[in-house]
Each structure stands twice: as C-alpha cells, then as structure tokens.
Amino acid sequence: MPKIVVVGAVAGGATCASQIRRLDKESDIIIFEKDRDMSFANCALPYVIGEVVEDRKYALVYTPEKFYDRKQITVKTYHEVIAINDERQTVTVLNRKTNEQFEESYDKLILSPGASANSLGFESDITFTLRNLEDTDAIDQFIKANQVDKVLVIGAGYVSLEVLENLYERGLHPTLIHRSDKINKLMDADMNQPILDELDKREIPYRLNEEIDAINGNEITFKSGKVEHYDMIIEGVGTHPNSKLIESSNIKLDRKGFIPVNDKFETNVPNIYAIGDIATSHYRHVDLPASVPLAWGAHRAASIVAEQIAGNDTIEFKGFLGNNIVKFFDYTFASVGVKPNELKQFDYKMVEVTQGAHANYYPGNSPLHLRVYYDTSNRQILRAAAVGKEGADKRIDVLSMAMMNQLTVDELTEFEVAYAPPYSHPKDLINMIGYKAK
C-alpha cells in the first residue's frame, strides 16, 4: 500500500489529498500542516474581518477530525516539515507544540506549503499581517479588545485593497500608504484611477510614495517626515514562497524561491510534486514562464497530480492565463493574460472601448472600460483588462475563453454575446473590440 505525504493542508494540499482518495481507496495519506487550521477559505478572510461573512465558521471548510471521518486521511496540524531527504524518501517533521522532531517516509511527496506574508520587520505590538485564519482571528480580537478606530493599511495590492474596504465597512477609519505610485500592479496603471476616486469619495486618506521610518507604540514616523498616531497597522506588502524546507533536498528552485515544475507538476526529483503558491509553470497562450498564486491554479494542479498518482498519466497542465478579479467598493477590476510589465516582450497593439455595461436606455447604466492587447504577428490576444461598476467579470471570462482557444482579436466580432437591455448591447463591447481592431 503506497504512502503519500502531503505538505500543506489548505487549497492545494487538502484538495489533492481529497482527489487522491476519491481515485484510490487504499493508499495511506497523511498531511502535515504547520499552522492551526486546515482547509480554510483564504479569499474569505478580508470579508470575515469586515463582518460581511458574519460567522467565521463559514470560512473553515474542514477540521482534521471531520476530514478523517469523511475521507480517512490523517491531518496533523502544528506539524511543520522542515527538511526533505529525497535520496532516502523521508521528510523531517517538527511538532511545533512539543518541539519534538521525527522522520516520516513517503512513496510520493506532494509539496503545497504555500507562501508567507512579507513583513517590514518593525517590532510592534499593533502590527499584523493577513495570511490565514489565525491572523484573521488575531486582527478581529485586537480590534474588539482595544476599541480600534484608526488603522494604517500598508500596500496597494488586492489583499490590502480588500482589507481596507472591509475595515471601512466595519466602521473603522483606515488610511492607505504605498511605497510607490504604482498601485494594483495586475492592472494597467492608467486603469486604476477609480481606486483613488473611491478613496476620495469616502474621504479615506491615502499617500503614495510613502513609507514607514519608525514605529514607537502608536506613534508612526514616516519617511516624508510626517508623524501620526494609529491604533493598528496591517501590512500587505506581498508574499514569498515557503521554500526553506527545500534547501536540504536536491529539488531545484528558481531565483525567486519557486519550484519549477513540468506539465504534470513533477519537480526535477522523482516522486516529488509541487503545487500551489510554491510552484512555477508557464502561460497557456504564450511561451513565457508564469507564477500565478491564485485559487484556480492550486485546485487544477491538485486534480492533475491526483490523477498522476492514481495512474492516469495522460492528463497534463496546459498553462495559466492568470485570470484575476477584485472588488473595491463600487468598482470591479479584472484582467487576464500576461502582466503589464511582460508586454514589452512582444510586438503588440492595443485596442480599447468604453461604453455602458448594458443598454444606455435601461436604468442604472454605468461606463465599462475594456482593453485588449494583441500580438501583431498572429493577432492573438496577449492580455485583456476591464474596469467598471458592472460587467467586467463577464467580459474578462469571455476573453479568457478566447485566449484559451488561441482565437484572434478579429474573431471577437463573431462572438454571440447574450443580449437583453439589462445586460449588454446588440453589439457588445467584446464585438466592438474586434471591429476596432480591424
């Protein structure tokens, strides 16, 4: 009976173990998770803080006990894999409660340790990061115990924006700072103006090109020279892959600490797979490497690895498109394809349309800005982005399907988009992009 060891019990690891059990009722499967919780909804965490998700239990999908009862898979929380001996096929595990170490053998090893939040490194009792349910509970408890009012949010990526919105909706007074003037880097820079407009509309303070110089209790000194007082600080300054456990092994890492994998999510070492935030693969529609630490990729990788281990080696990963979306107050920001800073590697043209998300005469209409970049050599779509109060998700998903099938920008004229006055136009924005490209 083969023994399968999984490192990490959140989206990638728990899903992969579950899929293996669905296909294989006999294997011995054990998951090691270094933190308190398994199988929680990462994407729900800002909304738990904002009390949009009113009960945190809805963010916790499984407990180890429930997981074992339903799937006969052992999950050990507070157990951190700290080393891998791929020649002996063992892992070294640290019990974080007792500080004891032991070795566990494996026939197949699945690495899904995820990523950790970066920190600016200041010693402060009021500073928090948000990466898991423990962090969420700590933030919520601190707010309640200390009657928090003023919160400094550092960073302007998706998580920071979602946290800021939810703090505001909870009735607190957040302020946003970011070390550069480039916010929400997955979007085109000039399409991010609605973020600043939404902040201005609600009189939420923000400062770009600003950084913290020192923290002394509740007194924050900024590099601009300003000194302000805050009850709480939440850092959203990016993440890094949890790859320290790899250093003892023969597994190759790239210069950023990610594990390169093939189309079966195999590493360079036999019997070891890597999925989720730690793995790097490639785009589907262009020949470029891609690291896309989002939920869809982790779940897709989990399914493919499960099939491989169960004996079906015909299924391979075809690549990422990087489809992503975020809500910020009244606006939705969505994009798909290569990142803005990767476009320079192509000879491309851009075409864009701004018009109502639905028929102009139907009430509640608002502008939707849609932009498409295409390769001039073959006219295939490289990237698309959309911003608006409604309809951005629909258009980006349609364009994602077009890119998946390597359609040209000209073929967008042929798309028969569902039309009724509350939803779109007889010639939708998708069609108009195709006509304008001609």
UniProtKB/Swiss-Prot annotation:
One of its GO terms (molecular function) is NADP binding. Its cofactor is FAD. The keyword Nucleus does not apply. Substrate binds at T15, Q19, R22, S39, N42, K71, H299, K427. Homodimer. The active site is at C43 (nucleophile), C43 (redox-active). Contains 2 FAD binding domains and a single NADPH binding domain. It comes from the Bacteria. NADP(+) binds at residues 151-166. FAD binds at residues 8-33, 267-277, 419. NCBIfam families: CoA_CoA_reduc, PRK13512.1. It comes from Staphylococcus aureus (strain JH9). Keywords: FAD, Flavoprotein, NADP, Oxidoreductase, Redox-active center. Its EC number is 1.8.1.14. It catalyses: NADP(+) + 2 CoA = CoA-disulfide + NADPH + H(+). Reduction of disulfides occurs by a thiol-disulfide exchange reaction, but involves only a single catalytic cysteine residue that forms a stable mixed disulfide with CoA during catalysis. Binds 1 FAD per subunit. This is Coenzyme A disulfide reductase. Catalyzes specifically the NADPH-dependent reduction of coenzyme A disulfide.
